[in-house]
Regions:
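Sterically constrained small-residue positions within well-ordered secondary structures
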Residues: 23, 43, 55-57
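C-terminal edge-of-domain segments
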Residues: 49-71
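Low-complexity, flexible helical/coil segments
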Residues: 12, 38-42, 66-71
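An N-terminal amphipathic alpha-helical segment
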Residues: 1-24
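Short, structured protein-protein interaction patches enriched in aromatics and acidic/basic residues
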Residues: 31-51
Length: 71
């Protein structure tokens, strides 16, 4: 699944991302594109046991790849 949150104002990117996370099954991958690094999202992901990777893009946006782990 892929979400493009560029151009959206807070808290909409976070809300869209959390909703998509709820729909994920174990092993699923979600890729989001944000204008900013979603620092509050990282805390949420760590608390819920998701793994993630953050990449800076050439256009200045951030690509975050999230994987739902078991447990």
């Amino acid at each position: 699944m892929r979400l493009d949150n560029r151009g959206l104002q807070p808290p909409e990117p976070m809300q869209r991302t959390l909703k998509a996370l709820e729909e994920m099954n174990i092993g699923d991958k979600l890729t989001i594109i944000n204008d900013r690094k979603p620092m509050f999202l990282f805390e949420e992901l760590e608390q819920k046991g998701y793994s993630y990777e953050v990449n800076s893009r050439e256009d200045g946006a951030f690509e975050i790849i999230i994987i739902k782990k078991e447990g």
